[in-house]
Amino acid sequence: ERVIFVSGHFNNFELMAMHIEKSGINLAAIYRPLNNKFLNYFMEKIRKKYICKNQIKKGSSGTRQLLSLFKKGSSIALMIDQRVSEGILSKFFKNEALTTTIPAQFVKKFRCKIVPIYIERIEDIDFRLTVHAPINFSEDETIDTITLKLNSLLEIMILQNPDQWIWSHNRWK
């Protein structure tokens, strides 16, 4: 059953997608290309070879590609903690933040489940991956309420162990 995996940029977040794909789940993940084009070239190769073969560039063409892969049976991995240029204003740590609606749109269109996933460093090179129970939203929930619930879930993950969260951009800009 295809699902939407959601998380934030926790510790070595790339390991989450790698684990999902290595466990036999066909996965597609959205990524934002690195600003350094030279490094981005190598990072894309590494991601496709070792982490997740279906790496989709962020943007409207990427969203269409993601939709196509989902319709063909792929699950999707999304980092929902990034500041986006399109989305809705939704509460995040008591302030309105522009937030992606992609997970909520997929829930509404396909009645799919959301699976929260969290990774934390235990020590040195040891990590603990927590795959939460799937969330099944009711049909009468709106894009806004689903998005708010996912932001609340992300807050809980962050507050669990704040030093594990890689917060490199301002969500409230």
Show where each model-derived region lies.
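Catalytic core of membrane glycerolipid acyltransferases/transacylases, capturing the structured
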Residues: 2-59, 85-90, 95-96, 121
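Non-catalytic C-terminal accessory region of glycerolipid acyltransferases
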Residues: 22-26, 60-173
